Amino acid sequence: METALAEVQLSCLLCEQTFDATEKLDEHLPTHFPQPVSTGQTCDICGRTMRSSLELHQHYKRYHEAHVPNTEGHFQCQLCDKVFLLQDHLKVHVKIEHATDGYQPDEKSLDWQHYSPRSLDTTNDYKLDPILCPPPKRKYPPRSPFFNPNLWLGADNCFM
């Protein structure tokens, strides 16, 4: 019986080339099915892969903004050395972290040229700032069967 298995010729279904061992056929098949070339962009910091360079840039801004090295056009906090790509994010950082420290940002910002620590009032700013106080979540109707499984119709009720 073993001699019959040894004489079996395996053929490739795509090019009809014959092989005497399954290992050789397995080595041959990748010639017809090459591995896809990775077109994704990989984050240097965390290793996550994005589909485009735009998604990678948005990923950097969202998750690694404080870890980006300081270059021209970036805004650096003078107290904790965090770096932000957008000036608005630096402002929010200042409001949250250093509002009572008497902090003055660097000269890149025109809004802060007339800044004095005594004039910074953060008591009512949180009501106007959408970053510090996001809008409330939407409320869905409590009687909606989509969100309440107790209101789902059983399959046995449909055939009566």
Swiss-Prot record:
InterPro entries: ZnF_C2H2-type_TF (IPR050888), Znf_C2H2_sf (IPR036236), Znf_C2H2_type (IPR013087). GO terms for cellular component: nucleus. The modification Phosphoserine is found at S116. It is found in: Nucleus. May be involved in transcriptional regulation. The modification Phosphotyrosine is found at Y115. This is Uncharacterized zinc finger protein CG12744. The keyword Magnesium does not apply. Keywords: DNA-binding, Metal-binding, Nucleus, Phosphoprotein, Repeat, Transcription, Transcription regulation, Zinc, Zinc-finger. A zinc finger (C2H2-type) spans 10-32, 41-64, 75-98. It comes from Drosophila melanogaster (Fruit fly). SUPFAM superfamilies: beta-beta-alpha zinc fingers. GO terms for molecular function: DNA binding; zinc ion binding. Disulfide bonds: none annotated.
